[in-house]
Each structure stands twice: as structure tokens, then as C-alpha cells.
Amino acid sequence: MKEYRALLALLHLASPSLPIGAYTYSQGLESAIEQGLVRDETSAREWLVEMLGIFTDFELPILQRLLKAFSERDEAAVSFWTECFVASRETSEFRAETVQMGYSLAKLVIDLKLGDDSMRAILENQQAIPLPTAFACAAEALGIPHEESLLGMLFSMAENQVLACVKSVPLGQLSGQRLLLSLHPVIEACSIRASQLTDDELSSWAPGLSLLSMQHEVQYSRIYRS
């Protein structure tokens, strides 16, 4: 029964209906579509695999460390990795995205009184709360195993990107589901790799994505906030 509760909690946390505004962000994808880099199902899959790789090298290992820090109620470690992640956001849109979503999820954690008082206090004490920090706190509070938490965040990111592709390329619904299904083994492999990276191996190096984000800030016509 405990396992079922953890699964239900994971499905809830990774749900696109979670009111944190994920659907309003494309993480540079809208700019890539505008420039013709993503134009069909094949190029969309190439983009998604590349994005999952970027997540694997930095965001996911940070999440893993935050999960451990929250489980040990280690406020210093939570603050260190939180500040590290916020500092890694190269553009104003990327920083605003993660802080807005993190704030919204943190508010849910606090208002719903998830976890214990000490855990929520650590969350509230952060100057800026990016999404990985809020996600880690929520996952730990809900009793979701760390490995499943990594998979949940990756799948949630991939699903959001696929939905943006379906709306903006545009692609058909069948293409979108085919894309998402094809990413299952990629997500699993990325989760395993992320869990094995040492601190010295973490890297947020993605200059092309940063340039797309900067260009999106001045893009004439857009429907997404990043």
C-alpha cells in the first residue's frame, strides 16, 4: 500500500494539471521553431533528446542532491545547491521561469502543509526558490523515492516540451504521443546517468540554448514566456 501511495504522489507531482504554470514556458523551443530548427517530428525528437541531455548533466543531479539534503534536513546543503542552480540560469527568461514555477510549487507545499515543520522552514528560508528545490521538498514530503522523483521530473519536462511541439510546430496528437513514447528509454537512461555524476562532472554548458533564450526575449510574435 505504501508503494501505491508513493506512485499516486508521483503522478500528482508530475501532472500537467499541477498549478505552477509549466504550460506557459517552452524553454527556448518557441525560438527554435521560429528559426526553423524544429519543424517536424524528426527534428522535434532531436531537440527533445538534446534537452533531456542538458537536464541530465545539471538539473537532474542538482535535484538528486536537493532530495538528499531535504531528507537529512540539511539547510546548508539545500541553500548551496539552490544558489548554485539559480546562478546557472544564463538569461532573464530562464531565471524567471524556474523561480516563478518554484515559488508556485513552494506555496502549494506550504499551504497544504506537506512534510514536517522543519522541512517547510528550510524551504521558506531560501532567498529564491527554483523549481528543483521546490520539487525536491514536495517529493520528499510526499514520500516519493529519489529514483522515481528523478524520473518524474524528467517525464514532466519531456511532456511539457512535447505539448509545446504539438501546438507550435504544429504536430498532430498522434505524432506527439509517438514522440513521448519514444522518449521512455531515453528518460530511463538519463535518470541512471544523472544519479552517477559526481559534483565535478556537473555542467550546465548549453550556449546554443542560451542564445535561443536571448533571441526569444526580443522575438516579435510569441505565446510562451520562455
Swiss-Prot record:
The keyword Chaperone applies. Signal peptide: none annotated. GO terms for molecular function: nickel cation binding. Keywords: Chaperone, Cytoplasm, Nickel insertion. It comes from Nitrosospira multiformis (strain ATCC 25196 / NCIMB 11849 / C 71). GO terms for cellular component: cytoplasm. It is found in: Cytoplasm. This is Urease accessory protein UreF. Belongs to the UreF family. UreD, UreF and UreG form a complex that acts as a GTP-hydrolysis-dependent molecular chaperone, activating the urease apoprotein by helping to assemble the nickel containing metallocenter of UreC. The UreE protein probably delivers the nickel. The gene is ureF. Required for maturation of urease via the functional incorporation of the urease nickel metallocenter. It comes from the Bacteria. Its main location: cytoplasm.
